[in-house]
């Protein structure tokens, strides 16, 4: 799992403005600032970024920042799609929010990034346990789809 950084952005519902940014490298080094410039420095030369629902949520805010800075965008791994693929028996695939005990308490993007990292580790273990034929079937069907391409 080397060289993956897990990212989470907190965005206001009414203005769609990023209000908090968190990230965790695969070696567990955290980042917690509301600065895209500093996030890009933290992500410098990282080949992969990951997150839970990163393709449909966080990437829409991150992509313009990479373009604006003239930076290469890392490849994307979305733990949400891997979760539904590797844990089909689960009723839902959202990250647990057990650290959010009060209804009005805002999400912590560093905690969510760490949860994505831990989920990805579970997903890797689940994939390794799959029958080799099922791995080949998954590869044949999914190796060129944006949602799970990076697994292969």
Q: Regions from the language model: what does each represent?
A:
Residues 1-152:
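DEDD superfamily 3′-5′ metal-dependent exonuclease/proofreading module
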